[in-house]
From Swiss-Prot:
Lineage: Bacteria, Bacillati, Bacillota, Clostridia, Moorellales
Record GO biological process: L-leucine biosynthetic process
Entries under InterPro entries matching the protein: IsoCit/isopropylmalate_DH_CS, IsoPropMal-DH-like_dom, Isopropylmalate_DH
This protein's name: 3-isopropylmalate dehydrogenase
Function as written in the Swiss-Prot or TrEMBL entry: Catalyzes the oxidation of 3-carboxy-2-hydroxy-4-methylpentanoate (3-isopropylmalate) to 3-carboxy-4-methyl-2-oxopentanoate. The product decarboxylates to 4-methyl-2 oxopentanoate.
Binding site for substrate: 96, 106, 134, 222
Keyword vocabulary terms for this entry: Amino-acid biosynthesis, Branched-chain amino acid biosynthesis, Cytoplasm, Leucine biosynthesis, Magnesium, Manganese, Metal-binding, NAD, Oxidoreductase
Catalytic function, reaction form: (2R,3S)-3-isopropylmalate + NAD(+) = 4-methyl-2-oxopentanoate + CO2 + NADH
Binding site for NAD(+): 75-88, 279-291
Family: Belongs to the isocitrate and isopropylmalate dehydrogenases family. LeuB type 1 subfamily.
Amino acid sequence: MYKIAVLPGDGIGPEIVPEAVKVLEAVSRRVGIEFQFTEALVGGAAIDARGIALPPETLELCRQSDAVLLGAVGGPKWDTLPPAERPETAALLPLRKELGLYANLRPAFLYDSLVEASPLKKEIVTGTDLIIVRELTGGLYFGAKKREQTAEGEMAYDTMYYTRAEIERIVRLAFTIARQRRCHLTSVDKANVLTTSRLWRDTVEDIKGEFPEVTVEHMYVDNCAMQLVRRPAQFDVIVTENTFGDILSDQASVLTGSIGMLPSASIGGAVALYEPCHGSAPDIAGQQKANPLATILSAAMMLKYSFKMDQAAAAIEAAVGRVLAKGYRTPDLYVPGTQLVGTAEMGQLVRRELEEG
């Protein structure tokens, strides 16, 4: 039996997460493995009920679970709070830290039936199937920072630093993932300017001998941003530091036609966190307009990376593909000639395909 902490969160979270849970229940029946789901508060919902974005009991539940499934946190309701107390900061960052999650995995895979939904031309975007491995615990976001008045006027600074050990663990993970895919790794840095990037590049060079079957290329981050829209199918696995990864993964998210299609995993410790890449979308919350597929695909990543159930994960991905191929679309993907469905109906369609497939 696997224990899964379920954190719906805010906005559309309580609508999309149950659909992923139901898909996992269908997997459970299909393969005969039991999942135990335990729900808890996080984010703005936790602030409203408990006065804190990450209650101790939620954190303890996550620690005692085998994996965590998260919906989304945040929204305008809590934007008046001090930045350090807002759901996005006060829930996600400490949760990642406490669980020891140092790597974020963001796949960008374009289903054939969604090629026309991409903002890029068909001939450019066809064949896109990449994953960005982003370092989560170092870099600018966690370095020393300050804003102050000086004799010369107001100034501010942020500090970027990395240890070789931090780089080694994320790079080895990326090599391992590349070895399981198409054996091509692109390491993204800014080694022509940044000292941290030069250490990053040197570390990649030192480690690549451990993975002789993987082809490695180094690419400056500005060039990578250009190549992602010029020829995205050239990429297999991209590994990069925190800030660059944050930007590039959001850029890659538009390739698939909707951010509502993009899952993610944060891994590194004993317990991994799985969540869709999109936010809480409070403007459509409670209206059955949200796309649950990113959350369902995040559940598939859970099966693959936490439970080593690769075949079950592939079955979910294939079920999603068949639903899309039949023309069913949530509002974010809808175009004339397709069949408009709501959140729960889309989840039901995936479950039906999974059970019949």
